[in-house]
Amino acid sequence: SGEVIEFSVRENNYLGKGLGVDTAISLSSESIEGKFNVTNPNYNNTDKSISFGLQALETDKLTNFGYKSKKIGGSVGTKFEYLEDFSLGISTSLFVENIETDSTASERQKKQKGNYFDNFLNLELDYDKRDQKFQTSEGFRSFYGTNIPLISDSNTFTNLFTFTRYNKFLDKNVFKSSFYFKSSNSITGENIKLSERITIPSKRLRGFEYGKVGPK
């Protein structure tokens, strides 16, 4: 099953200090993930946001793919409006990970069994021309993000680009179109880790069964 159950608690003015706190737990048939993030949207009245996050993720794909992964880490970063409607985000993240395999795993997968440490520099470019963030009716949003390996065994370089356009038609109707592209490659020619392989988010697929090829 591809069903995901999520519990989350969000607070936009924690302790009356304007801090944003976001805690979430996600459960699926193959994974459990916990996230905790704290954001100061206007650090020292500089119009720059400062954020800190922790993440723990366990992915169990022993049944279908012969491996299991446990990953824990955190990040710290800042985001600010560099030009009108154009925001720049810079952060760094650290993760430790353990990958286990069983007898059903391929020889290539078995070679990836072990412990890993990764440190990334993360960049985000966000150009937002929507008329409003919620219940958008017109405009577009273009987003590009990249994770650059600083210390890593596989040296995986990840790119993400999304583009979404909103057009109003027939009075109260809104047509939404979007483009999604993501890639992961090792800049040193290594095999990327099993946990870093790209999958299309289930919310972007319709009529497909999770973990399989083709429509239901």
What does each model-found stretch correspond to?
Residues 152-158:
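Acidic, glycine-rich flexible loop/linker segments
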Residues 185-190:
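Short, solvent-exposed, mixed-charge loop/turn linkers that connect secondary-structure elements
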Residues 57, 145-151, 182-184:
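Short glycine-rich beta-strand segments
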Residues 1-143, 156, 167, 173-175, ...:
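Gram-negative/organellar outer-membrane beta-barrel architecture
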